[in-house]
Swiss-Prot record:
Similarity-based family: Belongs to the GreA/GreB family.
Protein's GO biological process: DNA-templated transcription elongation; regulation of DNA-templated transcription elongation
Role summary: Necessary for efficient RNA polymerase transcription elongation past template-encoded arresting sites. The arresting sites in DNA have the property of trapping a certain fraction of elongating RNA polymerases that pass through, resulting in locked ternary complexes. Cleavage of the nascent transcript by cleavage factors such as GreA or GreB allows the resumption of elongation from the new 3'terminus. GreA releases sequences of 2 to 3 nucleotides.
Molecular-function annotations in GO: DNA binding; RNA polymerase binding
Domain of life: Bacteria
Protein name, per record: Transcription elongation factor GreA
Signal sequence residues: none
Amino acid sequence: MEKVPMTAEGYKALDEELKRLKTVERPAVIAAIAEARSHGDLSENAEYHAAKERQGWIEGQIAEIEDKMARAQVIDVSKLSGEQVKFGATVSLIDEDTEEEARYQIVGEHEADVKAGRVSVTSPIARAIIGKETGDVVEVNTPGGVKAYEITKVEWV
């Protein structure tokens, strides 16, 4: 079983989503199925078929989240330190061409949200900077071509 690295915050978010699916969504869809059944003939009952489809989706989501949580390797970022970039680090970069600053935290795949400054450990930018240190310049293959970034800061927040 392959372990899935994730931050404690990512694990907590998965746990909250799982609880919501089990305590809110699952009972609601069961009630919707019961309501649709009460309307009689199920062969032409669109409400029933829609509710059953939704139930299948919810059960799939629950199974997927439970699998991720079972395989989770939770990494407590607050206990990490050092200048070398690794999973969980928050890294400040400067684009060598445009002088634009960027700040990203390296997180697990399901936690990634570029707009919130979280990039997947498997993303091109993360793969390029992992193992590097403050002051290093890295080249990243982007859809727009190769870009050079200087690592200006490594934080553990």
